[in-house]
Regions:
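Generic domain-boundary/flexible-linker signal
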Residues: 81, 113, 188, 198-199, ...
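Residue-identity detector for glycine
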Residues: 70, 128, 142, 192, ...
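Short, Lys/Arg-enriched charge-dense amphipathic segments
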Residues: 87-91, 104-111, 186-194, 242-250
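Arginine residue identity/basic-tract feature
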Residues: 8, 22, 31, 67, ...
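Surface segments flanking catalytic/ligand-binding clefts of nucleic-acid enzymes
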Residues: 138-214, 218-228
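Structured alpha/beta reader/binder surfaces that contact nucleic acids or chromatin modification marks
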Residues: 2-139, 143, 147-161, 167-171, ...
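Basic, glycine-rich
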Residues: 182-183, 200-271
Length: 271
């Protein structure tokens, strides 16, 4: 059996401009400013093999979805004046960009949808994740325990957003999992033993918890053992917390769902 490719050589990039999408479809290239702070590694080291585009609300009926992708041919660093020679007196003319060139874009038979409107800059993932994704959250390729936890909550029909961005006055936070409830939202973090249990990261996590709590979030943290050896108990904590905060929000039908404690089946209540 062939070994599954686990390299993050597939990039889903933000597409928030119709003229840029026209360039992507007609001229087969996309640009990223070299000054971008969160530059995908696969772009910087030129190992990117595929690129897809996440459309924002400007695309109307195609908003918040991934519908097009292409195979990357070349990545180069060029100045803006080379990308847009027709623009005169451009104050950004000397700015440098990664120019990602690709084969003709291919339209997916069925789009990958985000149920909740989200602004996503980049998702670095694998071709396998892209092939199997039905929802935008399926695209994310996290740590092994994050992947295991995602499969577990999907099986239990617990709707969550992965790598959900919280922008505060102090800094940006990406939540491993965000669950939206009627009374209070829940942040779930999967704490790998090696990283999160070191002294410096324990202090960082406590500070992070305090900031999120002040914003009204409830935080649950689970270790590798919680997820790999005690997943049934861990999911029980999650369901109890959801029930405590008024049920989980279901975007598609604007309802809230509770979980029964006796048989783990979902009960639906409309508000």
């Amino acid at each position: 059996m062939a070994k599954q490719n686990t390299k993050r050589d597939f990039l889903v990039a933000l597409m928030n401009n119709k003229s840029d999408f026209r360039i992507a479809k007609e001229q087969n290239w996309y640009r990223i400013p070299c000054s971008t702070k969160m530059m995908p590694k696969s772009v910087a080291n030129k190992t990117l093999k595929y690129i897809a585009f996440y459309h924002t609300k400007i695309f109307n009926k195609d908003a918040y979805s991934v519908r097009w992708f292409g195979e990357v041919k070349n990545i180069s660093v060029v100045k803006r004046k080379m990308l847009f020679p027709e623009i005169t007196n451009d104050p950004k003319a000397e700015n440098e960009y990664y120019k990602i060139e690709f084969n003709s874009l291919i339209e997916l038979p069925a789009p990958i949808i985000s149920n909740r409107p989200r602004r996503l800059l980049f998702i670095s993932t694998t071709f396998g994740h892209f092939q199997n994704a039905k929802n935008i959250n399926d695209l994310f390729y996290g740590s092994p325990i994050e992947e295991e936890f995602w499969k577990a909550i999907k099986f239990e029909n617990i709707e969550a957003e992965r790598q959900y961005l919280i922008n505060t006055d102090e800094k940006l936070f990406y939540l491993d999992f965000a669950i939206f409830c009627k009374e209070r939202n829940i942040n779930i973090e999967c704490d790998g033993d090696r990283f999160h249990l070191s002294e410096i990261n324990v202090k960082r996590d406590k500070n992070r918890n305090n900031i999120l709590s002040s914003l009204g979030w409830s935080i649950l943290r689970f270790t590798t053992e919680d997820i790999r050896k005690n997943i049934h108990k861990t999911l029980g904590y999650v369901k109890e917390t959801i029930n405590r905060y008024g049920g989980i929000e279901i975007i598609s039908d604007k309802t809230y769902r509770y979980f029964k404690e006796d048989n783990n089946q979902i009960n639906l209540f409309d508000y």
